[in-house]
From Swiss-Prot:
Disulfide linkage: none
Name of this protein: 4-diphosphocytidyl-2-C-methyl-D-erythritol kinase
PANTHER family hit by this protein: 4-DIPHOSPHOCYTIDYL-2-C-METHYL-D-ERYTHRITOL KINASE, CHLOROPLASTIC
UniProt xrefs under Pfam families: GHMP_kinases_C, GHMP_kinases_N
Originating gene: ispE
Length: 286
């Protein structure tokens, strides 16, 4: 592949905790979470074209291009701004789909940010985040680009700085439907609200974890295995799990012993998204 291609990072995230506090009249869940951005993820490349067509050159198996959040994000920005240009898009897919680490939402956010720059739309990050909310509740956190304490349906974001840890992220090779988890009658929905100042990893949890472990034996077994090495938890609605380490080498040592039927990677937490680092390098961030 052409080494001159300009790749834009599309980082993963972890939910270091996920508390479900209730349900709104519209059916959405009231929640609190801590979004930790990671330094690894997918990559996207964009070639601006003079015609308005949006073309994803590297489609994802099982996902029609029309349903891909990358294409949806590009068209949403195009429609919102009246931009007459289009683009060809390439994707280097690293993150698992349906894993709870934000792959699709991150792809959408990077698309909005990159094309806002390349098409010279001049929208602010706040405007892009508001636009991105129509694509998914997690898109704004990737657009705003900070590790953040989230409330509401996940759209009320308070940027925070936390001690950066090393994480082993493990995918037990099964797909967990977010909709099925959130619609499950036995999902806890009454965890008391906390303030950011009260946050402590050991005093928080993921309200979706037990339900998913009850339904997916390989998630439960992999979590038990991880807990032998370090504090561990499910992220989002799964199926990805993570273990927390103080050094990269500790995480790599455990990765080397990963059980069969799982895949994984080691990553470091970052307070600022790699895509924001790229924007800063280009001299364009607001």
């Amino acid at each position: 592949m052409d080494q001159t291609i300009d790749w834009w990072p599309s980082p993963a995230k972890l939910n270091l905790f996920l508390h479900i506090n209730g349900r709104y009249p519209n059916g959405y869940h009231q929640l609190q979470s801590l979004f930790q951005l990671l330094d690894k993820g997918d990559e996207l490349a964009f070639t601006v074209t003079p015609h308005a067509e949006i073309t994803l050159l590297t489609p994802i198996d099982g996902v029609a291009n029309e349903d891909n959040l990358i294409v949806k994000a590009a068209r949403l920005l195009q429609t919102h701004t009246g931009c007459s240009e289009g683009c060809d898009i390439q994707l280097r897919k690293v993150l698992p789909m349906g894993g709870g680490i934000g792959g699709g939402s991150s792809n959408a956010a990077t698309t909005l940010i990159a094309l806002n720059y390349l098409w010279k739309c001049n929208l602010s990050l706040t405007e892009l985040a508001e636009l991105g909310l129509a694509l998914g509740a997690d898109v704004p956190v990737f657009v705003m680009g900070n590790t953040a304490f989230a409330q509401g349906v996940g759209e009320q974001l308070t940027p925070v700085n936390i001690a950066q840890k090393h994480y082993l992220v493990v995918f037990p090779e099964c797909h967990v439907s977010t909709a099925e988890v959130f619609n499950a009658p036995d999902l806890p929905r009454n965890t008391p609200l906390i303030s950011w100042q009260e946050y402590d990893f050991d005093q928080t949890h993921n309200d979706c974890q037990q339900l998913v472990c009850n339904r997916f034996e390989n998630v439960a077994n992999t979590l038990r295995w991880l807990l032998e090495y370090a504090p561990s938890r499910m992220t989002g609605t799964g199926a990805c799990l993570f273990a927390v380490f103080t050094s990269n080498q500790e995480a790599e040592n455990v990765l080397a012993n990963l059980p069969s039927g799982c895949s994984g990677f080691v990553s470091k937490g970052v307070d600022v998204s790699p895509v924001h680092d790229k924007l800063a390098h280009l001299g364009s961030i607001s």
